[in-house]
Amino acid sequence: MANNRLMPEGQIIEEDMDGEDQNARELDIDDDDDSELDDMRVMRLNNPQVAMLLDAPHEPPFNLHHMLGPVAMPTRPRNKRSFLTVAKPFHIQPQMCALVANGWQAVQHLQPEMRRDYFANYLYENMNSKNYPNGEGLPHHWGQF
C-alpha cells in the first residue's frame, strides 16, 4: 500500500509504508488549473461578449417592490347571469313508435333473461293490419324513430 503525502507546492508524492521514495511519483495539480485560468483570461481578452456572459449573475436580479405585497386593484363589476342561460342537463327521450313503446312497457315486469323473447313475441303478435292499418304509426325506414 502507498501512503500519500501533500507537499506545500501542491504536489502529491506517493510513498511506500516503509518511507522509501523508490516508487515516488509526483502529480502536479496546479499546472492543469493554471493552464485553464490562462485560457480563460485569453478568451476574455479576445471576446468581450464572452467575458460579459461569464461575469453575468446566474439568475436575474429580484425586483423587491414586487415582493412587498399584492397591489390593490379596483374590482371589476360582475355581469349578472340570466337563469335562462345557465346550462342544465336535459334528457331527451328517444323517439319510439307506439308498438315499440308498448312492447317496452310490457316487458318491464319480467326478469331480464326473459325480456328478449317476450319482446319479440309481442312485436310479432301485435304488428298486424288490425292494430296498424296500412302501416300507419310504424317507422318507414331504419332510424326514423
UniProtKB/Swiss-Prot annotation:
Task: Kindly list the biological process annotations in GO that this record carries.
Answer: sperm individualization
Keyword Heme carried by entry: no
The answer to whether the entry has keyword Nucleotide-binding is: no
**UniProtKB keywords:** Developmental protein, Differentiation, Spermatogenesis
Q: Name the segments for region: Disordered.
A: 1-34
- Please give the InterPro entries that the UniProt record associates with this protein: Soti
User: Which segments show compositional bias classed as Acidic residues?
Assistant: 12-21
TM segments?
none
Pfam name, any one: SOTI
UniProt record similarity statement: Belongs to the male-specific scotti family.
The function of this protein is:
Post-meiotically transcribed gene that has a role in late spermiogenesis; required for actin cone progression during spermatid individualization.
Q: What is this protein called?
A: Male-specific protein scotti
Annotated organism of origin: Drosophila willistoni
